[in-house]
């Protein structure tokens, strides 16, 4: 598209962000309810546009996994609308004043939650992200610029049409939600230079996309390169729990970034646990295993693990296994290979579990639970807009509050500084 100008769009989004910030909770919820209804009412049109993306994807030779993420069905449309209505039910964080304290001179000092401003989302496939990201940004009082992958352009524009119809009906600036219609790579390059108008970039997709955005942006970026999630089976583990959690965390959805990629097993219980794990992983999904020299004998057809295997995010029915001689060795391995996403310990020993929580600083640390719970909705945040594995400005799954920041508010009665 030769007439598209990203700088102009970003400027309009910046102006619209001031409108978004002033909407009250009732106004935002009314918008979101009507958006959910509009998406349902236009499901046939959205699915028709989605079919164009599917056909083009097949012609381009997209993988079946990518096509699965791209496809929209009647159920998918209903799920999208339900996700928006769940956002309606969330508490609006904007305008809350807390941490109010009285200073010796009589002034009261507090902090108020405010929107970030303009958020740019860069993502691949998954047209539902268009609707859910827009809804989260509206609810948190932000404007958003959405740049989906070229493989979903027809679907994204159809969803954007529903969003803009509702915004116009409510007499709200439609540039609160901007969907970039240009699929060229050069637009991403230009988008990442708009530091005067865009406040935050959130990339969602493969490691290559996220690294490209992080390395080329003049705007702060929420980073989450990959999910190398570890499961540590302690010598005081309940082995039945351990097997169930391993199978769930690895095989339920291996393409998810919260799936297990490495399991560490304490040597004291390895002879008991590994045969159970081998059978369970094979029965569940014929999981391919990369095993250390001390565990390879328990897994028929396993390959000998290398350091590269312990760094790998397989995103498939594949896992690395290592026997460790001590609790501290497990901690050391995790800290060496972590991606700061999610780590899990299975142990009935409270003191060891607490030590694990203290010594592992990934964004989510769990005790006796599946890594599959490392998800905004499962953690009680509602829909998540992304995951951060860098400690600034958010850490872990990001919900509504992560799309806001704080400003100081001061209440006085004529005080002056002496």
UniProtKB/Swiss-Prot annotation:
Q: Where in the cell is it found?
A: Cytoplasm
- List the catalysed reactions: L-glutamate 5-semialdehyde + phosphate + NADP(+) = L-glutamyl 5-phosphate + NADPH + H(+)
- Name its pathway: Amino-acid biosynthesis; L-proline biosynthesis; L-glutamate 5-semialdehyde from L-glutamate: step 2/2
Q: Which GO terms describe its cellular component?
A: cytoplasm
Q: Its GO biological process terms?
A: L-proline biosynthetic process
According to the UniProt entry, its GO molecular function terms are: glutamate-5-semialdehyde dehydrogenase activity; NADP binding
Q: Enumerate the SUPFAM superfamilies for this protein.
A: ALDH-like
Instruction: Tell me the enzyme class.
Output: oxidoreductase
Please classify the protein's predominant subcellular localization into one broad category.
cytoplasm
- Its Enzyme Commission number(s) read 1.2.1.41
Q: Tell me the keywords, alphabetical order.
A: Amino-acid biosynthesis, Cytoplasm, NADP, Oxidoreductase, Proline biosynthesis
Superkingdom of this entry's organism? Bacteria
Look up keyword Amino-acid biosynthesis and say if it applies: yes
Q: Per the similarity annotation, which family is this?
A: Belongs to the gamma-glutamyl phosphate reductase family.
In terms of HAMAP family, this protein maps to: ProA (MF_00412)
Functional note:
Catalyzes the NADPH-dependent reduction of L-glutamate 5-phosphate into L-glutamate 5-semialdehyde and phosphate. The product spontaneously undergoes cyclization to form 1-pyrroline-5-carboxylate.
Q: This protein is called what?
A: Gamma-glutamyl phosphate reductase
Source species of the chain? Colwellia psychrerythraea (strain 34H / ATCC BAA-681)
């Amino acid at each position: 598209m030769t007439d598209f100008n990203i700088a102009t769009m970003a400027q309009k989004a910046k102006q619209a962000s001031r409108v978004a910030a002033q909407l009250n909770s009732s106004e935002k919820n009314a918008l979101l309810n009507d958006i959910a209804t509009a998406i349902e009412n236009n499901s046939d049109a959205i699915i028709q546009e989605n079919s164009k993306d599917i056909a083009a994807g097949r012609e381009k030779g997209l993988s079946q996994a990518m096509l699965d993420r791209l496809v929209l069905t009647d159920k998918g449309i209903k799920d999208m609308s339900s996700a928006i209505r769940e956002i309606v039910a969330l508490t609006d964080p904007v305008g809350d004043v807390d941490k109010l304290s009285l200073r010796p001179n009589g002034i009261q000092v507090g902090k108020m939650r405010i929107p970030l401003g303009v958020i740019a989302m860069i993502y691949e496939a998954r047209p539902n992200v268009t609707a859910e990201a827009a809804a989260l940004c509206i609810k948190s009082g932000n404007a958003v610029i959405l740049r989906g992958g070229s493989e979903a352009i027809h679907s994204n524009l159809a969803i954007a049409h529903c969003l803009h119809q509702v915004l116009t009906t409510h007499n709200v600036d439609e540039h609160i939600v901007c969907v970039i219609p240009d699929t060229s790579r050069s637009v991403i390059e230009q988008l990442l230079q708009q530091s005067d108008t865009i406040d935050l970039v959130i990339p969602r997709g493969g490691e290559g996309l996220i690294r490209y955005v992080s390395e080329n942006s003049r705007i702060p970026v929420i980073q989450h390169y990959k999910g190398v999630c570890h499961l540590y089976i302690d010598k005081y583990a309940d082995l039945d729990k351990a097997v169930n959690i391993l199978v769930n965390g690895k095989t339920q959805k291996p393409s998810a970034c919260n799936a297990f990629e490495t399991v560490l097993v304490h040597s004291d219980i390895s002879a008991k646990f590994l045969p159970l794990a081998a059978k369970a992983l094979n029965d569940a999904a014929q999981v391919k295993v990369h095993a250390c020299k001390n565990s390879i004998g328990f897994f028929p057809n396993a390959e000998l693990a290398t350091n590269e295997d312990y760094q790998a995010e397989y995103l498939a029915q594949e896992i690395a296994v290592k026997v460790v001689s001590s609790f501290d060795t497990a901690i050391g391995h995790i800290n060496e290979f972590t991606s700061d996403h999610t780590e899990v310990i299975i142990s009935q020993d409270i003191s060891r579990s607490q030590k694990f929580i203290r010594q592992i600083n990934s964004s989510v640390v769990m005790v006796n639970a599946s890594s599959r719970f490392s998800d905004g909705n499962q953690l009680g945040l509602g829909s998540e807009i992304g995951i951060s594995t860098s400690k600034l400005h958010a850490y872990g799954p990001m919900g509504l509050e992560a799309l806001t920041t704080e400003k100081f508010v001061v209440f006085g009665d004529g005080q002056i500084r002496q």
